C-alpha cells in the first residue's frame, strides 16, 4: 500500500513538474465553477499565466508591457491593443507579448483588437465624479448610437446582422436582462408592442435561466448588458441558443462574451462607463430599443411611412432635449438638499413611467443607500399605500398623456395621507403644480420616447442626494460594475 501511494504521488509530482502550461491544464480540468486566474511560478520569473472559465478577462499589450484585467476601462490609459481569451484557454504573458494555448497545450493564434475608445473618456475631465460626467455625456453618446444605424431617415441593421426578412419571421420576443438593463427591457416591451403585433416578454436573467419554460419557435431573445459579461445574462443567452432561439445582444463592450456568442449584436456607443451606477449606457440601450422597435414595425409593414418619419424626427431630438434638462440641474440640486435625510422613498407611475420609476428608485438606493421602492401607480391601493404616512416622499413620473389623469388621482390619494410629492412631467402639464409639492418639467416628446428624458432628472437627483450625504458616488458599497458572479 505504501509503495502504491508513493507511486501515485510520484506520478502526480511528475505530471505537475512539466511546463507551467502542462501543470495548469491538468489543474483546470479538475476545477468546477467559474474563474478568472492569474498565476505566477517562482521558477519562471517575468511570466504570468492566465486562464478563465465563464468570467471575463482581457489582455492588453503595448511596447514592452502586458496587462491583465477583467474589463477594457481598467487598462485603457495604458493601451488600446487587446486580446480576448476564450473559455478554457490559457495565456502566457511576457513583456510586451502574449501566447495562447488550448487545453491540449497546443499554441493557438488570436487576432489583436484595437479599442476605438479615446483614453480621455476614462478620465473625469474636470467633473467632480465620473457619474456626473457620464450624465452630461448622454446627449453625445445617444446621438452617436442613433447615427450608427440611422441615416437619411432610414434605419439599416446591416452592422447588427438582423435583416428585414428575419424581422418578418419573428413571432415572439424575449428580453432578458438584469438591473438597469431590465428596466430598459420594460420600456422596450411597451414600445415594441405598441408599434407591432409582436408579443414581448421581459424576464430577469437570474430567474429566466432556471425556469422550465418552452420557448416559442421563430422567436428572438434580446440580451441587454452594458459589459457583455453579466453572468446570469450570459447563461440565459446560452440557454436560448441551446433551445434553438435566435439571439441578439445589446452591449456596450466590443468583443465581450455576449457580443461574441450572440447571433447578432447591436453595439451601443456609450464609450467607457466608469461609475458603477449606469447612466449613459442605460440611455444608449433605450435608443437602441427604440430603433429596433421602429425597424421591426417597418419591416413587418405595421407602420405607415408618415408615422415612421415622425418617429425618426422625434428620436433625433432626444440629445438636444436632454441638453435642455441638464441646463436646469440647479433646481434638482436644491430639492436634493431637502430630501437628503429621508429614510424611505417611493416611486410611482404607469406604463413606461412605471419602468422609469423603477430605474429612478434603483439609482437612489444604489448610491444614496436610501430605502426606495417603485410601484405601478394602480397597485398602491392593493397594499403599498399602507406605508404612506405624514412626510413620506413619493416621486411621481407622469409623462404618458393617456394615463395622466389616472396617475394624478393616485397622487391625490397619497397626498391626502400626508405624502410629500415630487412630480415629473412634460411642459404643458401645469396642473401638476396643483398636486405636487415640487415639480420638474421635461421637454415634450412622443410618448414612446419619454423615458429618455424623464430618467435624466432622476439620475441627477440621486447623484446630488448621494453627494449631499458624503458618499462615494462612483463606487457604492457592495456593488460592482460588471456582475460576473451568479
Per-range role (PLM):
Residues 105, 420, 435, 445-486:
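Generic C-terminus detector
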Residues 1-12:
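Single conserved hydrophobic/aromatic residue that forms the stacking wall/gate
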Residues 98-168:
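Catalytic P-loop NTP-binding/switch module of NTPases
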Residues 3, 168-310, 314-317, 397-443, ...:
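Glycine-rich phosphate-binding loops that contact phosphosugars or nucleotide phosphates
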Residues 26-73, 78-83, 88-90:
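Conserved catalytic micro-motifs used in adenylation/nucleotidyl-transfer and phosphoryl/amide-
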Residues 45-59, 128-131, 142, 179-188, ...:
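Conserved phosphate/anionic-ligand binding catalytic regions in large, soluble enzymes, centered on
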Residues 26-29, 138-142, 146-174, 264-393, ...:
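Active-site phosphate/pyrophosphate-binding segments
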Amino acid at each position: 500500500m505504501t509503495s502504491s501511494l508513493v507511486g501515485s504521488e510520484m506520478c502526480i509530482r511528475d505530471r505537475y513538474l512539466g511546463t507551467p502550461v502542462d501543470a495548469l491544464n491538468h489543474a483546470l480540468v479538475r476545477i468546477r465553477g467559474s474563474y478568472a486566474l492569474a498565476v505566477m511560478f517562482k521558477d519562471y520569473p517575468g511570466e504570468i499565466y492566465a486562464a478563465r472559465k465563464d468570467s471575463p478577462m482581457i489582455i492588453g499589450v503595448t511596447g514592452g508591457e502586458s496587462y491583465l484585467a477583467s474589463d477594457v476601462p481598467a487598462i485603457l490609459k495604458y493601451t488600446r491593443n487587446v486580446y480576448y481569451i476564450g473559455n478554457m484557454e490559457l495565456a502566457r504573458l511576457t513583456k510586451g507579448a502574449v501566447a495562447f494555448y488550448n487545453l491540449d497545450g497546443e499554441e493557438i493564434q488570436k487576432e489583436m483588437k484595437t479599442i476605438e475608445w479615446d483614453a480621455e473618456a476614462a478620465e473625469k475631465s474636470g467633473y467632480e465624479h465620473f457619474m456626473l460626467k457620464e450624465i452630461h455625456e448622454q446627449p453625445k453618446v445617444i446621438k452617436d448610437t442613433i447615427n450608427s444605424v440611422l441615416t437619411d431617415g432610414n434605419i439599416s441593421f446591416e452592422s447588427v446582422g438582423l435583416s428585414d426578412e428575419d424581422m418578418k419571421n419573428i413571432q415572439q420576443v424575449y428580453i432578458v436582462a438584469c438591473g438597469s438593463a431590465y428596466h430598459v427591457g420594460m420600456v422596450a416591451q411597451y414600445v415594441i408592442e405598441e408599434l407591432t403585433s409582436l408579443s414581448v416578454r421581459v424576464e430577469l436573467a437570474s430567474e429566466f435561466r432556471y425556469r422550465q419554460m418552452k420557448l416559442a419557435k421563430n422567436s428572438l431573445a434580446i440580451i441587454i448588458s452594458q459589459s457583455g459579461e453579466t453572468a446570469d445574462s450570459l447563461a440565459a443567452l446560452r440557454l436560448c441558443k441551446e433551445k434553438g432561439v435566435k439571439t441578439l445582444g445589446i452591449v456596450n463592450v466590443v468583443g465581450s462574451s455576449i457580443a461574441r456568442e450572440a447571433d447578432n449584436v447591436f453595439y451601443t456607443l456609450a464609450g467607457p462607463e466608469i461609475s458603477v451606477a449606469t447612466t449613459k449606457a442605460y440611455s444608449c440601450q433605450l435608443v437602441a430599443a427604440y430603433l429596433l422597435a421602429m425597424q421591426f414595425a417597418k419591416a413587418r409593414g405595421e407602420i405607415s411611412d408618415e408615422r415612421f418619419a415622425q418617429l425618426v424626427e422625434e428620436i433625433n431630438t432626444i440629445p438636444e432635449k436632454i441638453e435642455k434638462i441638464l441646463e436646469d440641474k440647479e433646481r434638482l440640486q436644491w430639492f436634493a438638499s431637502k430630501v437628503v435625510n429621508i429614510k424611505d422613498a417611493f416611486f410611482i407611475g404607469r406604463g413606461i413611467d412605471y419602468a422609469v420609476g423603477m430605474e429612478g428608485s434603483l439609482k437612489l438606493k444604489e448610491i444614496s443607500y436610501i430605502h426606495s421602492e417603485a410601484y405601478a401607480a394602480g397597485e398602491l391601493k392593493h397594499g403599498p399605500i399602507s406605508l404612506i404616512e405624514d412626510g413620506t416622499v413619493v416621486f411621481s413620473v407622469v409623462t404618458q398623456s393617456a394615463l395622466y389623469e389616472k396617475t394624478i388621482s393616485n397622487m391625490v390619494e397619497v397626498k391626502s395621507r400626508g405624502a410629500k410629492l415630487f412630480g415629473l412631467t412634460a411642459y404643458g402639464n401645469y396642473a401638476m403644480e396643483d398636486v405636487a409639492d415640487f415639480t420638474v418639467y421635461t421637454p415634450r416628446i412622443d410618448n414612446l420616447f419619454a423615458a429618455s428624458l424623464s430618467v435624466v432628472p432622476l439620475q441627477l437627483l440621486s447623484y446630488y442626494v448621494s453627494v449631499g450625504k458624503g458618499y462615494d458616488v462612483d463606487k457604492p458599497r457592495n456593488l460592482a460594475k460588471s456582475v460576473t458572479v451568479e
